[in-house]
Amino acid sequence: MNLEKQLHDGLKAIPELSADTGHLCSRLLRYIELIAKWNSTHNLTSVRNPESMITRHMLDSLVILPHVSGPGIVDVGSGAGFPGIPVALARPEWQVTLVESNQKKAAFLLQAVLELGLPNISVKQGRVEKIKLENKVDTVVSRAFSSLERFMSLSKHLSENDSDHCRFIAMKGEFPDMELMQLSSEFVVEKIVAVTVPGLKAKRHLVVIRYQPG
């Protein structure tokens, strides 16, 4: 199976995407090319195989769409742009902010935004606890960033404009029993959703949290 067919079939398996995924497919493939080009010198991701990138990065990022509310999205610890760039490609009407502390990875994100032509993405290089945003944030998402408690402690200020409305989504593999037990009471878990990534057997869970200041 070639890359285009693999990706196209995977996109078709995600109901939240439009029936015509051809344009999205071509842009995601271009994104994979950029990652491969930069990966040799910048070590953006340990996943080197393009086929694995489709499943473990692109489709893994896009299955969160039904649980994400826009238009204001923040991707904390974005790394090579997951899930923020695939989400921004699929939802061009949303405004996505990528937060990344690593200078080399942030440089890649800026280049990817430029080459992919993504005016709905902004890149913030720095530690998330130091980042200040003027616009309203609807969803803050993290993937392989840290524990639930640390993610929330460092990111909670991003919801200061409307903490009742903003939701935090942590993308996890196995059900995070221990991390849930360690969460402070101000971080209210609203739901935990098991999600299926097309072509991936590994377990995936989304933890949806609301910040409730004392």
From Swiss-Prot:
Catalytic activity line of the entry: guanosine(527) in 16S rRNA + S-adenosyl-L-methionine = N(7)-methylguanosine(527) in 16S rRNA + S-adenosyl-L-homocysteine
InterPro entries (alphabetical): rRNA_ssu_MeTfrase_G (IPR003682), SAM-dependent_MTases_sf (IPR029063)
Keyword flag Transmembrane: no
EC number: 2.1.1.170
Subcellular location: Cytoplasm
GO MF, any single term: rRNA (guanine-N7-)-methyltransferase activity
Protein name as annotated: Ribosomal RNA small subunit methyltransferase G
Species assigned in the record: Nitrosomonas europaea (strain ATCC 19718 / CIP 103999 / KCTC 2705 / NBRC 14298)
